[in-house]
Amino acid sequence: MNVVGLTTTTADRKRRAGQRLVVGLAGASLDADERAFIRDARPGGFILFARNVEEPRQVLELNRELKSLLPGELPPIRCVDQEGGLVQRVKAPATVWPPMRFVGNVGKLEFTRAVGRALAREVRAVGFDLDFAPVADVDSNPKNPIIGRRAFATSPEGVSRHVAAFIEGMQDEGCIACAKHFPGHGDTATDSHLELPVVEKDPGEIEHVELPPFAAAVAAGVGTVMTAHVLYPALDEDAPATMSRRILDGILRRRMGYGGVIVSDDLEMKAVRGRYPLEHQLAKASEATVDVFLVCKELHLAHEAWEGLIRLAETDKLEDDRAVAACRRWHALRERFLRHLAPTPGLDELGCARHAELALRAAAEGAQS
């Protein structure tokens, strides 16, 4: 397996640092500054949002262009948030899915697998490799402003069963899944896009409610796990989960046995931005075994993150070793999912009769449950 950055030259450190970034774009096509950054930093992936989407053919061509700019053994992993409900970046003529709560309410795991397969086929049809789905949070707080019906259920048992089934369906179709937001964003009363949520629970309650869906995701072979910018004082009173070695390395990796890729939530979110210096965020998150960092919109912040990761590796041998380990995991994900990938589904998959029938059934049966 060819893995970037196994020597200690400055060039390799720069390449490793770029590999650890998944960056967003400003619009529906690349501008000159974005092209220059891609040429210099060679990021490990990209994430597209509604602002980048005009229609399916345009998204497919943009994703193809992004891949063509970084040829060779390290193709970028092209990502999207396509959950269903309010979080759908590619809309009609793609299937418009109800919230995953409706899918969970249907109560049949084979149905959930079928939805995962259908979503995977549609995002792959427009050129994506990874869907930041499913939400593995338990909707346990009625005052939660950001999770709600994005979660499959209000119980850890229900979320666990449907998260595992969805991941199996999605990854069976060759699309990398992501369980988010570890160790849980379901019992917050604030939105981490706006401020740092704090979950005041004892360890036993966290063990019983928040963690089981993520354990189920790990058992199902999930390709990636996304962190939560949430503070759990009972687990770590000093740092939010994204920056907590006790939570990520101690619980997710060591206790749950997860050896895959850990992705940070967006570094632009106000839960962390402005509260912690960027280089401190990067250092603590990397120490906690975060592999890849999301910078979803601001190119200047992506550039600062790239330079920050380079500086950390140049001044700290342990950080240099962590960067190598992160790149190994990121590239192992490519090897697992992209090397022997089935042919890309055609654009006629979007909104096809089979998928429309699934969405209609979820909307009808799930709303009544």
Where are the regions a protein language model picked out?
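Preference for extracellular/luminal or secreted protein segments
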Residues: M1-A41, R255, R273-S369
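Acidic-leg catalytic submotif of subtilisin-like serine proteases
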Residues: D81, L119-D129
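N-terminal hydrophobic targeting/anchoring segments and the immediately downstream early-domain regions
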Residues: M1-A94, S369
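Surface-exposed, active-site-proximal loop segments in enzymatic domains
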Residues: K91-N105, N141-F152, H193-L194
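Divalent metal-dependent hydrolysis catalytic cores, especially in the metallo-beta-lactamase
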Residues: G45-R51, D129-D137, T289-F293
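Second-shell residues forming the walls of enzyme active-site clefts
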Residues: G24, R51-G72, P76, L86-Q88, ...
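Glycine-rich anion/phosphate-binding loops
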Residues: E54-L62, G104-R121, A153-R161, G204-V209
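Second-shell loop/turn segments in exported
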Residues: A28, F49-N52, F102-E110, G148-S155, ...
